[in-house]
Amino acid sequence: MGQVLPLVTRQGDRIAIVSGLRTPFARQATAFHGIPAVDLGKMVVSELLARSEIPPAAIEQLVFGQVVQMPEAPNIAREIVLGTGMSVHTDAYSVSRACATSFQAVANVAESLMAGTIRAGIAGGADSSSVLPIGVSKKLARVLVDVNKARTLGQRLKLFSRLRLHDLLPVPPAVAEYSTGLRMGDTAEQMAKTYGITREQQDALAHRSHQRAAQAWSEGKLTNEVMTAYVPPYKAPLSEDNNIRGNSTLADYARLRPAFDRKHGTVTAANSTPLTDGAAAVIMMTESRAKELGLTPLGYLRSYAFTAIDVWQDMLLGPAWSTPLALDRAGLTLADLTLIDMHEAFAAQTLANVQLLGSERFARDVLGRAHATGEVDDSKFNVLGGSIAYGHPFAATGARMITQTLHELRRRGGGFGLVTACAAGGLGAAMVLEAE
């Protein structure tokens, strides 16, 4: 086991997560169509503060993330502060770590708390797949810059004459890795082939995810951590996630064709997480500050770890790399955990990471560790479903997972929980949480 790194302040205070909240998650171009991420972020932070009854002035820092950034609001964190009635003196900055963005936001606030520069802060993230920064071609972009410098009408017309019709077409946001040109689904297909993950196994995990998420909603387990959203044109509120298949049957998944490798693939739209809109946030503070304010924390941040691997082959192995580090830093083993919540970007990616956590060979030959991290107990794993069912607004998923896991730990009488995710660029994130 590696070095234990206690997450405490200089006074010995633990890092408390006192409350968390999210919007319902909505499939692309449905309930939140036309609502930018910054508005979703304002919505959730406003409601989170109202429910917590914490004076806004008590929040000294807000760290927020957005993966699909909009040029008109590049610092989403500061816009949220200015748009929610918080003190204008509240420090605010934005972060981005692909699908692990709100993991990073939480880590940053934790570091500020440990350094003693703040005593309370908010961390979270928001993304919209329905409001996207549609760009222009490189040639048109260059001409527009040159036109701005041109002095005469003739010079401007000459510049525009260089353009062809195809140069005027809009350019949607890239869906592939900048460095490799590979889409996330291509990597999921790689992993399915490398680790022998069958189509049947992927479909079964997706079905399980929807079943458990639907059950969590029907049993009222998510009611207190998901707000009701009212958005223009205000025809109907959204109070639950709209991607979950309440009547999921395994036979339905077999009907879909592969989405990436269309001839020989096994990754489909149904066993992958969909493009989604939503926002989530958590309030964090030192343990002593929570006591001063009369607050009972949901739980505590015990440890965290971030990792990075090569992007060309099987790059979505972040959980298999980051989990053992986070456990070492918490002074725990996988067997000590009450719950394990892994981000389901794709069923293939999820199953590959589960497989490698239990692999002695991977631990020895790749991680350089004496023993495997451990076999994942199915009764502890994604017990309320995962991202395949809930959806995945990139920057919001980590905060959703943290809030959801802490609530479930408390329902079970406390214990330790792991939340972990892969991310674009070969990145990985893992956090160990504790509830009493």
Curated annotation (Swiss-Prot):
Its main location: cytoplasm. It catalyses: an acyl-CoA + acetyl-CoA = a 3-oxoacyl-CoA + CoA. The gene is fadI. It is found in: Cytoplasm. The active site is at residues 99, 392, 422. Pathway: Lipid metabolism; fatty acid beta-oxidation. GO terms for cellular component: cytosol. NCBIfam families: AcCoA-C-Actrans, FadI, PRK08963.1. Catalyzes the final step of fatty acid oxidation in which acetyl-CoA is released and the CoA ester of a fatty acid two carbons shorter is formed. This is 3-ketoacyl-CoA thiolase. Transmembrane segments: none annotated. The keyword Nucleus does not apply. Heterotetramer of two alpha chains (FadJ) and two beta chains (FadI).
